[in-house]
A protein has these predicted regions:
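Cysteine-cluster motifs in flexible loop/terminal segments that predominantly coordinate metals
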Residues: 42-72, 199-205
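N-terminal beta1-alpha1 ligand-phosphate binding loop
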Residues: 2-30
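A short beta-strand-loop structural module common to alpha/beta enzyme folds
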Residues: 32-42
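Short, hinge-like loop/turn segments at secondary-structure boundaries
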Residues: 51-55, 132, 161-163
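Helix-loop-strand module that forms the ligand-binding subsite of alpha/beta enzymes
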Residues: 60-147
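Glycine-rich phosphate/pyrophosphate-binding loop and the adjoining helix
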Residues: 141-205
Length: 205
């Protein structure tokens, strides 16, 4: 069992990284393999809606997005973590997720998703909601904790002082592990749900 963790902060050793390290520690204790991918400090451009991925199965911009796609395919869960910028996720992470989710044609149903947000003070709820939308449009169950998954701190290292926030992300990792294992057992016994066909429509027709 494996989880891919995305660090959307430009700081490889900041508070977002610390929150992810706490989750990785729990996953290791639970026997879950982890891979932490540093996203926020990379030059990632946004989607240009060229449609190339519909023909080739990968993004036309051959960068870390395509490199992460295979890890995402093999993973049982995905954690997207970001600092809060103007009540939103880091734009680099947003560009990464837009392209990752749109360009990958493999079935993401029942992979477990979770988001973690880090802020000095406010904007956590809006950012948390923003990141979770990638999961809920993809048939991915969203793992939760005993509180919304936010950690507070400004200067690197301050997140360690947010004892409630750290407990929140550690419990998130425990709940996520349970959910991944439960889904694996369910798939083994019952298989995936057989979905109704979908006919895409516009609001004008």
């Amino acid at each position: 069992m494996k989880v891919l963790l995305l660090n959307g902060s430009p700081k490889a050793n900041g508070n977002t990284a610390y929150a992810l390290s706490q989750m990785a520690e729990v996953f290791a204790a639970e026997g879950v393999e982890t891979e932490i991918l540093q996203v926020g400090n990379q030059p990632i451009r946004g989607c240009i809606a060229c449609g190339s991925c519909r023909k080739t199965g990968k993004c036309v911009f051959d960068d870390v997005v395509n490199q992460a796609a295979e890890a995402f395919r093999e993973a049982d869960g995905l954690v997207a973590a970001s600092p809060v910028y103007y009540a939103s996720a880091n734009a680099t992470l947003v560009a990464f997720l837009d392209r990752l989710f749109y360009s990958t044609g493999f079935d993401k149903r029942m992979k477990v998703g979770a988001s973690v947000v880090v802020a000095r003070r406010g904007g956590c709820s809006a950012t948390f909601d923003e990141l979770n939308k990638y999961f809920t449009i993809s048939g991915m169950p969203v793992a939760s904790s005993h509180y919304w998954n936010s950690v507070h701190g400004r200067a690197p290292g301050e997140a360690a002082q947010d004892l409630e926030g750290i407990a929140t992300v550690r419990n998130l990792a425990k709940n996520m592990t349970f959910l991944m294992k439960a889904i694996a057992l369910g798939k083994e016994k019952f298989g995936l749900p057989e979905l109704d066909p979908v006919s895409p429509t516009h609001f004008i027709r």
